[in-house]
A protein has these predicted regions:
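Short intrinsically disordered, low-complexity coil segments enriched in acidic
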Residues: 1-2, 104
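Bacterial N-terminal signal peptides that target proteins for export
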Residues: 2-17
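Bacterial N-terminal signal peptides
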Residues: 15-29
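Short, surface-exposed patches at the edges or C-terminal ends of soluble domains, predominantly
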Residues: 32-286
Length: 286
């Protein structure tokens, strides 16, 4: 009798353990599936862009790039101040052509403040990604205040320019090697030697590849990166290269760069900045 009772308890215990194991396995599978289904968050912030500024609007000249990104990112757009609350859950932050002056009779745009620098530095060092896009002259570009932020990562914009170029990137270039960059004119990035964020050029201006239009061809970095703390920063010296007309190869300013891989370059940069692995690409690869 006692033996039968003991065997019954053993069977019950075994069934209970099996049920718990299956439950735990199911929960783990669901969690893994949910994690895989969640896309990294890309925030296109318009906070530093002046009210009334028509360049690079999310439903304008940046509509196509943001539409494509939605296939791999949870793309969000807003003009709210950048702080701990608005950056919560954001994997990569995009800032394009921050405005210097007011547009028309609108209020002047916000410039980077000490509080912003603190919040954004913490965000990046704790694992966030930042992509900042500069530009050429006459684009209402603000760099003085923005550089105070970028210098935290050993990077800074300059007022030295290079005209439109069709750049074949060396195959050994990390992340974007072997691709063709349609570069539509911009400034240069300086890097600070020995900085703890490990700033370095990713794309140096290849003087052997001549401008398609214009004569400015300044040696230096057209795209530079840094890795402060657990985060990733990419600073690019042109904002028009991911606009609708650049991606469609209609061209900008009367110059059309054919065969460019601008979407694939930005896609890879966005994944690198977000700390995620890029899936199979949709255009040319190495």
């Amino acid at each position: 009798m006692e033996r039968k009772h003991s065997m019954k308890h053993c069977r019950l215990a075994h069934s209970l353990l099996l049920s718990l194991f299956l439950l735990a396995t199911g929960i783990a599978d669901l969690a893994a599936a949910d994690s895989a289904a969640r896309k990294p968050v890309l925030l296109y912030s318009r906070y530093y862009n002046a009210v009334g500024e028509t360049r690079y609007l999310p439903d304008g000249t940046y509509k196509d790039i943001l539409t494509r990104l939605r296939g791999e990112f949870d793309v969000r757009v807003h003009s709210e101040p950048l702080n701990e609350q608005t950056l919560a859950g954001v994997n990569v932050l995009l800032i394009a052509n921050p405005s210097d002056k007011a547009v028309g009779t609108n209020l002047p745009p916000p410039h980077v403040t000490a509080a912003d620098i603190g919040a954004l530095t913490r965000y990046v060092e704790q694992g966030g990604g930042l992509i900042a896009l500069g530009n050429q002259e006459n684009h209402n570009l603000e760099i003085e205040a923005m550089n105070k932020l970028l210098l935290r990562f050993g990077l800074q914009f300059t007022n030295l320019y290079t005209d439109v170029k069709k750049l074949v990137l060396p195959r050994e270039t990390p992340v974007i090697g072997g691709l063709l960059w349609g570069y539509y004119t911009g400034n240069l990035v300086l890097t600070t030697p020995g900085h703890p964020a490990k700033p370095r050029p990713l794309v140096l201006n290849d003087l052997a590849q001549k401008p398609l239009n214009g004569t400015r061809d300044t040696p230096g970095a057209l795209l530079a990166v840094a890795e402060p703390g657990r985060g990733h920063v990419a600073v690019v010296t042109d904002a028009g290269w991911i606009s609708n007309d650049a991606l469609s190869e209609k061209g900008i300013g009367g110059v059309a760069i054919k065969g460019q891989d601008n979407w694939e370059i930005f896609r890879r940069l966005a994944h690198w900045a977000a700390g995620t692995a890029a899936s199979a690409n949709s255009s040319k690869t190495e």
